[in-house]
């Protein structure tokens, strides 16, 4: 049986002084190397799951573990930079004044320069944008920007990669193509990932398993039916 890479146990999250929690008794797990997906309507709490795992939201109760290391729970709230978690956002969040390779290198500033450059080159080749290394974000298409954002998130070798509706701003044809590309990149890297989407087609395209989120709770898990060939 493969190792559990991410585990949420009885997680409760509420915003501000709200008496109604966004997440209520939320529990789930993701195995190492698996691409899991949370599927649900807007406002169901699925993005809050990512924010809680990333360290952007504090838990009212419950626990979160990454590779059996507790990162959140009673008396514990590791800051985002110490969680070994990467995140790809809807809006890419690239730095406009940095080139593609500088964006990818941003989280590697403590790495020796030679090793940093080798890692950046490896990732730019992986996302097939090595020839665009010196391009600025405004010189790249939406799909290319998202691949650079993916490379940047993968650069520091995160234990878990979180993807929050990563293709929602793209047209249908580009979403389909990029979904296939990102899935293949994650598999090639052996990367454990948790994707959030409201699109069942996108979930089926990318994920090994799909969990449904309703009213802040994890409802059901099923295997996706996409071909891995």
Where does each model-flagged region fall?
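Conserved ABC ATPase "signature" region
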Residues: 69-72, 114-132, 183-184
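ABC ATPase NBD coupling module
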Residues: 70-86, 110, 117
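Short coil-to-helix segment of the ABC ATPase nucleotide-binding domain corresponding to the Q-loop/switch region
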Residues: 98-105
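A short, proline-enriched helix->beta-strand linker immediately N-terminal to the Walker B motif
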Residues: 155-159
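Catalytic Walker B motif of ABC-type/P-loop ATPase nucleotide-binding domains
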Residues: 161-165
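Conserved H-loop
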Residues: 190-198
């Amino acid at each position: 049986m493969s190792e559990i890479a991410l585990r949420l146990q009885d997680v409760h999250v509420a915003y501000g002084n709200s008496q109604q929690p966004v997440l209520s008794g939320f529990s789930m797990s993701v195995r190492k190397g698996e691409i899991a997906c949370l599927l649900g309507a807007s406002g169901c709490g699925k993005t809050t799951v990512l924010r809680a795992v990333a360290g952007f939201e504090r838990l009212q109760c419950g626990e979160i573990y990454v590779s059996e290391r507790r990162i959140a729970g009673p008396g514990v709230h590791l800051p985002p930079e110490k969680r070994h978690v990467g995140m790809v956002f809807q809006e890419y969040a690239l730095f406009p004044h940095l080139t593609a390779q500088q964006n990818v290198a941003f989280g590697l500033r403590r790495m020796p320069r030679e090793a940093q450059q080798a890692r950046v080159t490896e990732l730019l080749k992986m996302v097939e944008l090595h020839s665009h290394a010196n391009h600025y974000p405004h010189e790249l298409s939406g799909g290319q920007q998202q691949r650079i954002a993916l490379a940047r998130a993968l650069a520091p070798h995160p234990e878990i990669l979180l993807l929050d509706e990563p293709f929602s701003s793209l047209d249908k044809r580009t979403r389909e193509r990029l979904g296939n590309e990102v899935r293949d990149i994650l598999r090639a890297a052996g990367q454990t990932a948790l994707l959030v989407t409201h699109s069942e087609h996108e979930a089926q395209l990318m994920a090994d398993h799909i969990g449904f989120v309703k009213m802040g709770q994890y409802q059901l898990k099923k295997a996706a039916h996409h071909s891995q060939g």
